[in-house]
Amino acid sequence: LLAFQVQADPIQNTDEETKTEEQPGEEDQAVSVSFGDPEGTSLQEESLRDLVCYCRKRGCKRREHMNGTCRKGHLLYTLCCR
């Protein structure tokens, strides 16, 4: 069993993402996800660095998969990543 601790920080969308995807609203928040030590670990490969995740109230959208949960205050959200 391998467990990840997800540290979520708000990120800014690029112009390309903004044009092609729905803007995160009140119920969706973009977050950056980092795994392990900031200096780098065996878990922090290229594929993990490019992971984009959202905290969503109602579940994941197309091309996203559930990667766990995230918390804002006392509310619990679904962590959806692509």
From Swiss-Prot:
Propeptide cleavage-removed residue intervals: 9-47
Subcellular location per the Swiss-Prot or TrEMBL entry: Secreted
Keywords: Antibiotic, Antimicrobial, Defensin, Disulfide bond, Secreted, Signal
Ranges for region Disordered: 1-43
UniProt xrefs under SMART domains: Defensin_propep, DEFSN
Gene Ontology cellular-component terms listed: extracellular space
Record family assignment: Belongs to the alpha-defensin family.
Protein's recorded name: Alpha-defensin 17
Annotated organism of origin: Mus musculus (Mouse)
